[in-house]
Each structure stands twice: as structure tokens, then as C-alpha cells.
């Protein structure tokens, strides 16, 4: 699933090509046809959500879930995915923006309402970590690993940055939320934010050490084979180092 840093980069790419441009065609016609002739006035990432705003007050709200993505082409350029996978197409004089496979594509009159349920966006320049901590205190998540994926607590963190931020902090993903103090959670959130900020703004694919995707391979820090197990109701695969993130790990580091 694209995480907040990926959506941030996507929004930046769309903003460069669409901001201030007039839509000459929009498909599907039945749902997006009324965007024809409208000017794009903003592109904003909100956690894992993306909003494209128009001068008539409407906004195109998309969420990529597991397999969705936005592509940008020149008119006449061959698409890298089949046309039948397109869920939204916006054309301007020099750009064709195509959203493929997104399960959520909707035109909304109140874009704030569409994302009101989300916690503070971790990549927002005004990220409110204290509000995220207040929301965490009300979360029903049992473990710290599950809490970090709760988008109503903090929007944007996904499984990759969850695993790697916890590893960097030396904290077991199965640590009960009930035994996690605010200082520890603040440190994890700010670590995830910094990792995601570097990822969002780096040229190319940034190389940051971590354990995600390394099940059975050596931990980059201590060499212990990385463990992997499904976690939470969604059974997301969680990667962690039993030595670096076990009892006393913070002291050893």
C-alpha cells in the first residue's frame, strides 16, 4: 500500500503538471464530466489520501489502498498500464493524468469532510504530535505496531515505516499500548516522520536501513535473523529483530 511519503511525491508530481491548468476532458464522463472547463487550484496529500481541487469548489478525492497509483503522461504517450484499469482520467492542454486501480475515487463538495476522520498528517509542515498522542490515548489498538497503522491517530504511516521506525527506536512491535508512555510514542512518531520526510524529498529511491521485507535475513544492526509474523486484525506482516527490539534493547544500543 502506498504510504504517506509516496502520496506526497505523487501530489508533488501532479501539482507540477496540473496546478493552474484547465481540464479539457475528464473521464468517466458520468462522474467526472463536469470537471471539463474547470481550473485546477490545488493538489494536496493528506496522509494516504490525495485531493485535487478545482475552481468550482469540487475536489477529486482518491485513495490508492494496495494497488492504486497516479501516472502522468504527455498527450499521445503510450500508457504503462491497460486503459481498462483507469479509474479517473484528467486531461489538460499538455498533460494526461491517469489514476489506475484506486478503489476510492470520488468527486466531493466538502473535501475537509472527506478526510475529517484522519489524525494529524505526519508529513504536514505543522504536524501536531501532541494531538496524535491525545488520539492515541483513545485508540482501541492493543499493540504499538497496530497503533501506528491507525490512521485516526496519525495519518500517513504504513507497514513499511511502522516496522522500520520501531526497529530504529529499538522497540518491540508487540509492546502493549497500555504500557507505552507518551515520551516513547512521541519518539517513535517523530522517528517515523523523519524517515518519511527523507523518503518523500529524496531524489530517486532513498536508501535507509530497516528490517521491513528482510524476514530471515540478517538484521542490518546486529546480524540476528529478522523475525516476521502477521499482526492485528488485518494480519499485516510485521518485521522485527528479537535482539535489537527485545528486552533491554534500548540500553544495549
Residue ranges and their predicted role:
Residues 1-253:
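Structured catalytic/nucleic-acid-binding cores of DNA maintenance enzymes
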Amino acid at each position: 500500500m502506498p504510504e504517506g511519503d509516496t502520496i506526497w511525491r505523487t501530489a508533488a508530481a501532479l501539482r507540477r503538471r496540473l496546478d493552474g491548468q484547465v481540464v479539457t476532458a475528464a473521464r468517466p464522463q458520468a462522474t467526472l464530466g463536469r470537471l471539463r472547463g474547470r481550473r485546477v487550484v490545488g493538489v494536496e496529500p493528506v496522509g494516504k489520501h490525495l485531493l485535487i481541487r478545482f475552481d468550482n469548489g469540487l475536489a477529486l478525492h482518491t485513495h490508492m489502498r494496495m494497488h492504486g497509483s497516479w501516472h502522468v503522461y504527455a498527450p499521445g504517450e503510450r500508457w504503462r498500464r491497460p486503459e481498462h484499469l483507469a479509474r479517473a482520467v484528467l486531461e489538460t492542454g499538455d498533460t494526461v493524468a491517469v489514476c489506475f486501480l484506486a478503489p476510492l475515487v470520488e468527486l466531493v463538495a466538502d473535501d475537509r469532510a472527506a478526510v475529517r476522520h484522519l489524525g494529524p498528517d505526519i508529513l504536514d509542515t505543522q504536524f501536531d504530535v501532541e494531538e496524535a498522542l491525545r488520539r492515541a490515548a483513545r485508540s482501541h489498538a492493543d499493540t504499538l505496531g497496530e497503533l501506528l497503522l491507525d490512521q485516526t491517530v496519525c495519518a500517513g504511516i504504513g507497514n513499511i515505516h511502522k516496522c522500520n521506525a520501531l526497529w530504529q527506536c529499538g522497540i518491540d512491535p508487540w509492546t502493549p499500548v497500555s504500557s507505552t508512555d507518551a515520551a516513547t510514542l512521541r519518539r517513535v512518531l517523530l522517528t517515523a516522520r523523519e524517515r518519511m520526510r527523507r523518503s518523500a524529498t529524496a531524489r530517486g529511491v532513498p536508501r535507509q536501513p530497516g528490517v521491513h521485507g528482510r524476514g530471515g535475513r540478517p538484521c542490518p544492526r546486529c546480524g540476528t535473523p529478522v523475525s516476521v509474523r502477521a499482526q492485528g486484525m488485518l494480519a499485516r506482516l510485521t518485521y522485527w529483530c528479537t535482539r535489537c527490539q527485545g528486552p533491554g534493547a534500548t540500553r544495549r544500543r
